Amino acid sequence: CMKELAGIDQVATIPDFEDAGYETAQAVLEESAKFNEGVVAPLNWSGDQDHGSWDNGVVRASKGFKEAYAALAEGGWQGLGQPLEYGGQGLPKIIGAACVEQTMAANLSFSLCSILTGGAIEALLTAGSDELKTRYIPNMVSGKWTGTMNLTEPQAGSDLALVRSKAVKQDDGTYRISGQKIFITYG
């Protein structure tokens, strides 16, 4: 599939991806499958039985999720397609996307943490200052920090055209955030 549909051998002709041909893609996908089968998939059923909760102001993930995410990050899976200069492995996004697909198939609820963190990294790479990139991306790639999704507001649901929350830059370079969110995915 990586050869025929993804054209991985053509991707390997792009500068900086020369070592990311079919053999590399196959090896990475095989290791990803082992990780997901051995670590992530077993948490699917147990996560449904002992789901996450909000207890006295503290978010508690399903048993095993924290340890599994630490293993995911330590194994380099969070940084697979992220730039080398921020601690990533610099592999083509197509290889990273295939690995994310395996994680999603193994346990969709667990995979959201990695997916949302990847989305936050992508937002920083696209629109963040060099200072923000240097501060946040290495911590997200390493698994020390994660990303969330904060869209839903009481008056808007998830209709982004109707959200009212604002981030106003302050003189000291920080942002003052005002508004109300009613759901924070992986918060």
What function would you assign to each model-found segment?
Residues 1-112, 131, 135:
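Amphipathic, small/basic residue-rich leader segments at the start of a protein or domain
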Residues 7-8, 105, 122-130, 142, ...:
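Short, well-ordered loop/turn and helix-capping segments at boundaries between secondary-structure elements
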Residues 53, 117-121, 142, 153-155:
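A glycine-rich phosphate-binding loop feature that marks nucleotide/adenosyl-phosphate handling sites
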Residues 81-85, 112-116, 150-151, 181:
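Glycine-rich, histidine-containing beta strand-loop boundary motifs that form or position
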Residues 89, 131-187:
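Glycine-rich, Trp-frequent "lid" loop and neighboring beta-strands that shape
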Residues 112-130, 157:
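N-terminal glycine-rich flavin-associated loop
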